[in-house]
């Protein structure tokens, strides 16, 4: 019996050249399968005139990751200048285990969107402001950054290369994520020796699961988002993981998001987990002043200007939590959330309801902003860039 098994094993052992041939065959079939999968992914759902769309359920996008076909990659040379970037298929990137971004969190990101007009043309909304904000953030994180022209060009190329992933008008937007990171290896604490700038994209719908319904927020008193002198005013990646615990706890209790208070007195409103906050009382709209702990949102800035144009008194100041609980309306702004109404806020077991709906200040401001972003309202401010 033992001899039989030994003999059988000998017959099953292949020569080295046959092993290699077998592995090559498997690799060939794997490559063919991957290629077939990519081609299947490229099949359009439908074609409307000259517009071809990717195979997605455009009516139920949500805010999940559906990677578009291409990403833009640009490296920083040793002299601190960024080289010519290029488009490449979306996919994984290689990083050393000792990369600065992995060990010390040296990275910042931006968020912008491409919008499709009714005629199929694509628009960007104030991408130059994202570029400027990234430069300011890079200075704070001691990183070189792309020039404004390099940044905007990268965003344009990414949007155009992924045009079929831009949702049909009224179905959503193409969320574009520029990311700047310390990709070079380093052991001791210090700036990375190399930096990589990547821009990738994903079609998205509403950020919150509530869609356009009003949000229910919880005022967080234990955890804080940022402190004076820190990096709360820039889009550092280090600002976001620390909010997950408070956010998860709030969601488990049925809330949409968390409102953070200042870290010193814990009495003044700062912002939500990923968006700015506005408080409406009569014809006055207040929002927390940017003092280094609050992100200077581009949507925030745009909404403030639209509100001023409509005759509201817009005030940037320290907003006491008691003012929030006595407000007529509260709403949030951001690239992802756009302009989102707040239905209730809970603070120290007290729950307050706010005005929402078509006649609310929030909805009026949102309608104007979205109208400009999508080309339905004439842009007389120079905010929109046609990239066709």
UniProtKB/Swiss-Prot annotation:
Belongs to the class-IV pyridoxal-phosphate-dependent aminotransferase family. Branched-chain amino acids are synthesized in chloroplasts, whereas the degradation takes place in mitochondria. Converts 2-oxo acids to branched-chain amino acids. Shows activity with L-Leu, L-Ile and L-Val as amino donors and 2-oxoglutarate as an amino acceptor, but no activity for D-isomers of Leu, Ile, Val, Asp, Glu or Ala. GO terms for cellular component: chloroplast. It holds the Pfam family Aminotran_4. It comes from the Eukaryota. Residues 1-22 form a transit peptide. InterPro entries: Aminotrans_IV (IPR001544), Aminotrans_IV_CS (IPR018300), Aminotransferase-like (IPR036038), B_amino_transII (IPR005786), BCAT-like_C (IPR043132), BCAT-like_N (IPR043131), BCAT_family (IPR033939). This is Branched-chain-amino-acid aminotransferase 2, chloroplastic. Its cofactor is pyridoxal 5'-phosphate. It catalyses: L-leucine + 2-oxoglutarate = 4-methyl-2-oxopentanoate + L-glutamate; L-isoleucine + 2-oxoglutarate = (S)-3-methyl-2-oxopentanoate + L-glutamate; L-valine + 2-oxoglutarate = 3-methyl-2-oxobutanoate + L-glutamate. It comes from Arabidopsis thaliana.
